[in-house]
């Protein structure tokens, strides 16, 4: 049985994001949330970090049921041109119980 995969991420919007209308931005974000739900994944937390760093606007954690779900979600991000609108860094991990 596969174990959950946690994705820790930080990100910021690029200039192209701000060229979109509010409706276009909301549509993309809704599609991202739909993709998470369809894969059985969830966003555990999303934090504003703009007040604590010059580099990132947000940080968060998402939980995926398995690595295949992570890969499918990344494909969904690519289909939505997410990399055109954002710059981000992420790290995958599994639960550690020492």
Model-derived segments and their meaning:
Residues 1-57, 65-75, 93-98:
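Short S/T/G/P-rich N-terminal loop/turn motif that feeds into the first structured element of a domain
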Residues 75-82:
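Short, surface-exposed basic-aromatic patches at helix termini and helix-loop junctions that form
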């Amino acid at each position: 049985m596969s174990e959950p995969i946690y994705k820790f991420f930080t990100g910021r919007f690029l200039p192209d994001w701000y060229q979109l209308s509010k409706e276009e931005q909301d549509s993309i974000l809704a599609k991202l949330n739909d993709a998470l739900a369809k894969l059985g994944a969830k966003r555990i937390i999303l934090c504003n970090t703009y007040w604590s760093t010059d580099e990132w606007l947000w940080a968060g954690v998402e939980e995926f049921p398995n690595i295949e779900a992570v890969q499918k979600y990344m494909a969904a991000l690519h289909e939505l041109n997410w990399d055109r609108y954002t710059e981000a860094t992420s790290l995958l991990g599994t639960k550690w119980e020492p």
